[in-house]
A protein has these predicted regions:
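Active-site cradle of extracellular carbohydrate-active enzymes
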Residues: 128-138
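Conserved metal-phosphate-binding beta-hairpin within the catalytic cores
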Residues: 101, 182-202
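Short histidine-centered catalytic/ligand-binding loop motif
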Residues: 39-54, 139-163
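C-terminal helix-cap and adjacent tail motif
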Residues: 111, 119, 202-228
Length: 228
């Protein structure tokens, strides 16, 4: 099947396929700074041999679990030999949203609200949404603001929140079986031609904060432990 490059990303390239779907090519490039891997950085900082492969493997694993639970995603199939994943077409909300689900109070949450809660305290699958905007530091945005700005309807937000909490629990339960604890995780969503919300992008170690025996596991170590 012929493919046409339509977008070159930091960690993935996107190709249009003849059948109307898209092909994501996972790369070994990682976001980071000064040669140090950091999923929170906004530019490619280094190349790690095999990282594209492990990110694709984890994405396949969890997308199949999420699809089996009846939750809509863009995942169609994947080819590990050429590190690609075929996905359904989807439009992003606005210029892109990131949705975080938190089971523990850490990271930017504790920096914002540390005077009200202890670091590491339990949270009830707390969901927050940010605009993808590097220049503004990915600002938080509320449900009311998203509706008022015409980015998404209240119904789409409610669907996205419900999906986020269910997907997060699926991943947390799986990690728990492996002796690990999910603290928080980041997702991206889009919608199809009928306005149905769907999970897009990837489900990889660089998008989640995971601990084992009280110690943080960096994304590359997490990937190795996950498939050990």
């Amino acid at each position: 099947m012929e493919k046409k490059l339509v977008y070159t990303g930091k960690t993935k390239d996107v190709f249009a396929l003849e059948n109307g779907n898209y092909l994501l090519k996972f790369k070994d490039d990682c976001t980071g700074k000064d040669g140090v891997f950091d999923p929170g950085e906004n530019s490619v900082g280094l190349t790690i041999d095999g990282v594209g492969d492990v990110n694709l493997r984890m994405s396949i694993y969890f997308f199949e679990k999420v699809n089996a639970a009846g939750i809509r995603t863009h995942f169609v199939n994947a080819n590990l030999e050429d590190t690609t994943m075929e996905v359904l077409p989807a439009k992003v909300f606005g210029q892109g949203l990131e949705v975080i689900c938190r089971h523990k109070a850490v990271g930017s949450f504790i920096r914002r609200y540390g005077q009200y809660i202890e670091s590491g305290a339990d949270l009830p699958a707390y969901v927050e949404t940010t605009f993808k905007n590097d220049a503004l530091g990915d600002p938080l945005v509320t449900k009311d603001a998203l509706a008022a700005l015409g980015v998404m309807t209240e119904e789409q937000y409610d669907s996205m929140k419900d999906m986020t909490q269910k997907i997060t629990q699926i991943i947390a339960d799986d990690l728990k079986e492996k002796g690990m604890v999910l603290y928080d995780i980041k997702f991206e969503y889009g919608y199809d031609a009928d306005g149905n919300v769907m999970l897009i992008d990837e489900i990889a170690s660089g998008n989640m904060r995971v601990y084992k025996d009280g110690e943080y596991i960096d994304p590359m170590t997490l990937s190795k432990l996950f498939f050990a």
